[in-house]
């Protein structure tokens, strides 16, 4: 189906060719608008027939008495068949085989979460086959058949904020991010972090705030080239999917896992769901791609191949708010001040591609000030769409004061105000009252 392509932009001759392919008769006497209407009607009938055929085929096949329910993330191979990955989006002996016929019949794609019945493994050298499809990404089968491809969805600026503040006392990181660098649904944000600046703690705080305040959002934390103990800590600290490829695994695995996570998020957005990916880190993902990409003979400063940035940029660039419904928010950490020239080049290449930036300041962390946010260098494009008048005024006063004095001085005072305030409104009033005098 050529769903998503605007028929109105086609010429009459192009529309006639499409109509002929759909076996629509007497198109020569029809006007352009009438041809478009006929094409839409025919496509709708074909979709309904495809769904009806798929459901009738499933009903014809009797459910074996020994069938068990299976669940996994689909990974479609180049040969047309696929496997449901049941553990960490990676291949294992527990995977479930999906035939090419089922993939075509139900319009299945890589990244779809499939729940269905499968036959238990008879031969230890073979995979359990999928027999019946019950749901796709938690929705009925007809929704997957009618969904628009991700590439044809209309991206727009974020308009709805992901509130990290619980509205009560404390929770300084959530309150400060909401005020200084708000995150909207569909944001493409970068957390710029030097070593030991508290980025992992900040990621956990953001993840827990999102799951608590926005239960409708699907949260995925992607850890690339991280320490195994950090993966365990993240799994135990947050309520969401933690997908990982630790530093002791091959760079090819880093790349494959990140591609699967992106496909998973895109499939959910196609079905009008809100998704948040927290990636730690985009620097290490680019490094992994640099080791796996076919050398072009050209290198940037630091030994980085220009082609190594293509897939990380595709990943980061997929973040968007969708006019038709749904959103994909990506917050990725970028490592700076590591002593590696390659890391600096990677950051420079991604600088400006996002629409939100949260810069961490190591000097604040050394003074045990958390969150160690650099007030001047952090911000969100078009933040006025997500902030109230009171919040905008408070943020303006904070930035002006940070420019006049020092980041550490302002942050220390802000943390005192936040910890003493009974509510978010009380905090904003105190900030405006205090800085308004100066």
Regions found by a protein language model. Name each.
Residues 66-68, 76-80, 89-92, 108-112, ...:
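Short flexible coil/turn linkers enriched for glycine and charged/polar residues
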Residues 26, 91-92, 104, 123, ...:
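Short beta-strands and strand-coil junctions in structured, solvent-facing domains, enriched
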Residues 54-144:
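N-terminal "pre-motor" subdomain/linker immediately upstream of P-loop NTPase catalytic cores
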Residues 197-198, 206-438:
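P-loop NTPase catalytic core
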Residues 120-191:
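P-loop NTP-binding catalytic core
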Residues 183-203, 225:
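Glycine-rich phosphate-binding P-loop
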Residues 1-81, 88-94:
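Charged, low-complexity terminal tails
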Residues 64-70, 172-176, 261-266, 315:
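Phosphate-interacting basic helix/loop segments used at nucleotide- and nucleic-acid interfaces
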């Amino acid at each position: 189906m050529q769903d998503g392509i605007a028929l109105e932009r086609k010429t009459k001759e192009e529309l006639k060719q499409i109509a002929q392919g759909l076996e629509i008769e007497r198109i020569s006497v029809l006007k352009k608008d009438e041809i478009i209407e006929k094409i839409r009607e025919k496509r709708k009938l074909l979709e309904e027939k495809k769904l009806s055929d798929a459901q009738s085929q499933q009903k014809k096949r009797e459910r074996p008495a020994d069938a068990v329910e299976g669940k996994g993330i689909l990974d479609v191979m180049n040969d047309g068949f696929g496997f449901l990955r049941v553990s960490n989006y990676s291949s294992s002996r527990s995977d479930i085989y999906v035939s090419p016929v089922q993939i075509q019949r139900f319009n299945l794609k890589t990244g779809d979460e499939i729940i269905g019945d499968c036959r238990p493994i008879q031969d230890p050298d073979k995979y359990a086959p999928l027999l019946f499809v019950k749901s796709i990404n938690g929705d009925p089968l007809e929704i997957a058949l009618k969904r628009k491809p991700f590439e044809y969805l209309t991206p727009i600026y974020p308009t709805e904020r992901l509130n990290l503040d619980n509205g009560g006392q404390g929770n300084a990181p959530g309150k400060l991010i909401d005020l200084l660098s708000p995150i909207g649904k569909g944001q493409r944000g970068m957390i710029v972090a030097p070593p030991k600046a508290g980025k992992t703690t900040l990621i956990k705080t953001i993840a827990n705030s999102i799951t608590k305040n926005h239960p409708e959002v699907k949260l995925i934390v992607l850890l690339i080239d991280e320490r195994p103990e950090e993966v365990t800590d993240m799994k135990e600290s947050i309520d969401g999917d933690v997908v990982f490829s630790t530093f002791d695994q091959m760079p090819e695995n880093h790349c494959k896992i990140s591609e699967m996570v992106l496909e998973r998020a895109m499939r959910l957005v196609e079905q009008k769901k809100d998704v948040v990916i927290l990636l730690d880190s985009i620097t290490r993902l680019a490094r992994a791609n640099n080791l796996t990409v076919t050398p072009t003979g050209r290198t940037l400063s630091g030994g980085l191949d220009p082609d190594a940035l293509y897939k990380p940029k595709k990943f980061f660039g997929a973040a968007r708010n969708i006019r038709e419904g749904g959103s994909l928010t990506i917050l990725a950490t970028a490592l700076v001040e590591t002593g590696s020239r390659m890391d600096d080049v990677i950051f420079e290449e991604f600088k400006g591609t996002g629409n939100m930036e949260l810069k961490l300041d190591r000097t604040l962390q050394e003074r045990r000030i958390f969150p160690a946010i650099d007030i001047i260098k952090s911000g969100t494009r078009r933040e006025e769409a997500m902030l109230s008048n009171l919040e905008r005024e408070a943020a303006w006063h904070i930035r002006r004061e940070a420019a006049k004095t020092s980041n550490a001085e302002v942050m220390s005072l802000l943390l005192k105000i936040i910890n003493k305030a009974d509510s978010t409104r009380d905090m904003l009033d105190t900030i405006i009252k205090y800085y308004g005098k100066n």
